[in-house]
Swiss-Prot record:
Name the record gives this protein: Protein L83L
Location in or out of the cell: Host cytoplasm
Family stated for the protein in its record: Belongs to the asfivirus L83L family.
UniProt keyword annotation of Cell membrane present: no
A GO CC term attached to the entry: host cell cytoplasm
Main location: host cell
Record's note on what induces expression: Expressed in the early phase of the viral replicative cycle.
Lineage top rank: taxon: Viruses
Record text on subunit structure and interactions: Interacts with host IL1B.
Organism: African swine fever virus (isolate Pig/Kenya/KEN-50/1950) (ASFV)
Stretch list, region Disordered: 1-26
Keywords attached to this entry: Early protein, Host cytoplasm, Host-virus interaction
Task of the protein: May subvert the host innate immune response by interacting with host IL1B and interfering with its function.
Length: 83
């Protein structure tokens, strides 16, 4: 079994930071996921990942990524649905 993805601690830290941002500020709709620069899957017991999806849910709240800036380029990050 390939365990290389499990060793990507940087992705796990960045994703946990973003999850915490939404958890602490449930009304904040801005895309804090911009901080996540990794596009690999990470293992987490309380998350079910859907990679490269444009929308995701946190505690039954739905978030849609909105590109910002002059180029309006979508960032490639992982998304998750809390289960």
């Amino acid at each position: 079994m390939d365990t290389s993805l499990k060793k990507n601690n940087g992705a796990l830290e960045a994703d946990n930071k973003n999850y915490q941002n939404y958890k602490d500020e449930p009304d904040k709709i801005s895309d804090v996921l911009d901080d996540t620069k990794y596009n690999s899957m990470v293992e987490c017991c309380h998350k079910n990942y859907s990679t490269f999806a444009p929308q995701w849910d946190v505690k039954e709240r739905n978030y849609i990524d909105v590109p910002e800036g002059p180029s309006a380029k979508k960032s490639i990050v992982h998304r998750c649905t809390i289960i």
